[in-house]
Amino acid sequence: MGTKKGNLSIDSENIFPIIKKWVYSDHDIFIRELVSNGCDAITKYKKLDMMGECELPDDYKGKIQVIVNPEEKTLKFIDNGIGMTAEEVEEYITQIAFSGATQFLEKYKDKTTEDEMIGHFGLGFYSAFMVADEVQIDTLSYKEGAAAVHWVSEGGTEYEMQEGNRTEVGTEITLYLNEDSLAFANEYRAREVLEKYCSFMPVEIFLSKANAEPEYETIDEADVLDTDEVVEHITEEPKEGEEGEPKQKAKIVKRPVSLSDIHPLWTKNPSDCTKDDYIEFYRKVFMDYKEPLFWIHLNMDYPFNLKGILYFPKINTEYDSIEGKIKLYNNQVFIADNIKEVIPEFLMVLKGVIDCPDLPLNVSRSALQNDGFVTKVADYISKKVADKLNGMFKTDRENYEKYWDDISPFIKFGCLKDEKFGEKVKDSMLFKNLDHKYLTLEDCIKANGGETAEETKAEETTDSEETKETPKTNIFYVTNEQQQSQYINMFKEQGQDAVILAHNIDSAFITYLEQKHDNVKFQRIDADVHESLKAEVAEEEKETFQKNADSLTEIFRKVLNNEKLDVKVEKLKDENIASMAVLSEESRRMEEMMKMYGMGGMDTGMFGGQASLILNADHPLVQYVVENKEGENVELICKQLYDLALLAHKPLSPQEMTAFVQRSNQIMRSEERRVGKECRSR
């Protein structure tokens, strides 16, 4: 064939600057696109062989070679796939590939950065011009009698094609890198990108550096393969003083190691995978050497093809930020991390891989949001996670409880974000009580003397004509076992129980549960003084008790300079407690909501959010205040009792803590003087 020259299109002059702009953050995708093309060529070659349209050599093994050459500033991609004739180069490169790039541009031109294309797929061969000033193709088709073809283009606007000199079936693409992209001729940078996108492609991928000095290894002679390049045969004599026959060794050129695991774990049958396989794969992909708690192996062929593995990592419940990483693949080619349009938002705390060949990729993120197929994929993934959790709850309760503290934030978040998921797992929710035993919601209701949903429903059926309000069962909870230990001890002494809700998500979650279950009300242990903690006031003492209560209210309001302070006087069964602070559940929820929305600096008092002071009428210090209203130590004692009550309720502000410490020192010095005076009087 003679030399053929041509122009692609006048519009092409505008394509590449715009493409570079839009895929700037993923500037390295050209490697994925070119390797994917080579992978497709090998796959087609194998299919033609299976169909009897060609015959592969007996020792055929599909492979892709990537060769960096920093001296010549080039990057080569070589595959032994199907190859192309001159007509096919004309069709696929000059027409179809260019058309694909044009369509890519059309999709992109009206997109904002918030509505980017998923994975930038569809750019294909022309992604090479993002990094190269010149691109050359040398190819030879598998077809009998086909001539080799050499194609070259500078800048992607004009091309020249003539007969080439390639002798092996396949394609070689050479990129002459521009000055801004020379880093891709570095072996380490190329390896980084290949491992990012191509670690699990179904074809072996080898990376090498042009003109590099060969590396060698020594192996047993019996292990030499036909493909090995033997440099030297070595006879190793036994060491002095040792018996045995001489060992025959061979020095060979070091065997290349593929960067691609062509049979990743998610493509295998779950029954063929061991625990060690799953853990090893997790560590390899996520570079996390802590073991995951457990995992779910997804394997679906109908109505769509989806495979993958989702891992439940150990979550640190002390922090707000819970971030996982789910990698999305298409036929073992990496697309992107954490595509929230495909993967339900609450699953983003997990780690895993999902491979869905049927997923539309050459569309924008906004288009995916309204795609019915994508919705089905997300629903399926959510259902499989719920099924796994329910299965563990029913058949492996011991381990489920062991994992609960780590997985509960994820499950609660899932309930808040996905109503279907919440409905599926509602019976598998657990609550840890003060004895660190795990209860279901129904267990909690029964433990607090309430009726379960089934019992309530049965009563309503029996007396359907009478309309009555559903009785609510209070479920008490604590958020900080150390800070609220005073209340916990009082509860335990009276045989009361509470559940531990220590994670930041729990405030929203209990509101969600109250909306779902109208027979349940959650109340923090210090929201009020439970009746079981109070002693009854004798009838003959009630008048005096009320007078003392009024007097104490007046004294504390005056000393604390707070006329709005709510003071309640109770006879507590625990005589060791002088004062307590309580904040109604409604006020606390309002306070937490304000903090969540960045309104923490506002005065919560305007919403009735001030803590009430509870004084124990039977405590000596409280009695001292009543009996010595004008005493010199009354002000000191009142302020100290108030701060002690707050300390068991919440942390003091820096100013409050400073004043509290100063008063504590004053009390100790006063006690020291008193003891010293007594000693001297003896």
List the model feature ranges, each with a label.
Residues 1-185, 192, 199, 217, ...:
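GHKL (Bergerat-fold) ATPase N-terminal catalytic module, capturing the glycine-rich phosphate-binding loop
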Residues 71, 675-676:
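Generic N-terminal leader/processing signal
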Residues 117, 135-158, 178-181, 188-674:
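GHKL/Bergerat-fold ATPase module in large chromosome/replication-associated machines
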Residues 676-682:
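Positively charged, low-complexity/disordered segments
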